[in-house]
Amino acid sequence: MTSESYITKLYFKKYFLILFPIAVLISTIGFILCFFVFQDNTTLCILTNIITTLSIIISIAVPALLAYTDKIKGKKAFEIFRTEGFTCKFCDAYRKIYIDKGNPFPLHVIMCASYYGKISEHDTARILLNKIRNPKKLDSYSRFMYYLEMLSMCGKTGNWCKGEEVRKKNIGFLQNYVRKHKNNPELRVNMDIALALIDSAHGHYGDAFTLLNSGYKPKDKNDENFLNILINAVYIYSLAKNDDNLSTAIINAETFLKNFTAFDFPWCKKYYEEQIIRASQGKL
């Protein structure tokens, strides 16, 4: 699910930058009015401080309230996600809450596309991603996620030509973003997987495996990043019709999954089992 703290940050970035200058303007107008209405300096100072304080409180409270409202709205979708996982029901609920009404944050649109992609609704994912008209104007995290989802969607649908275009134009940004956030290895893993999907769609299976074998080591036996690498290896061997290595890749993924001792949600084990099966059939 989309990070609540990051969504809160986006609300503050969007509305505080609008409301704070208005607050300053109101304070200035209030000072001028008080200056002409009240000649007493003490009264003038008190009223000016009150107006300034209220203006600042409003400029902070409004984005905070909107972020809280966003969180409340998302409870229904999160409850479906918590109990059922990535399902059409969850994706539709998320879309209804965040996308179909009002002016959604681009990050909500991108994440909704990602969720549809996880249930192989790639046409819907493409429609949603096409709503983002100018990704270079997004904040860096949203922009990074947008390119990952575009690459992933193009790779899974075989549209390597469009994927290579996205890759060529934005690989510098993607690599720089990963370097700046090297304390978050999940970003590097997801980037390498997305790029590997483009290579595999183009038939460059060796390049795809070079990306998957970029040196990431599992941090423990419950490492979902490493499991995703193994599942995508199954998928790429299936596309390459390399049956011997496919059998080994399936065993590797199933064995690593069996060693898991903890999942974030009860449905995760079954979800990953199904992903391994689908990947072995050349589907993701």
Which ranges hold each PLM region?
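Flexible helix-coil transition and linker loops at the boundaries of alpha-helical arrays
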Residues: 94-102, 133-143, 173-185, 218-224
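Hydrophobic alpha-helical transmembrane segments
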Residues: 32, 39-57
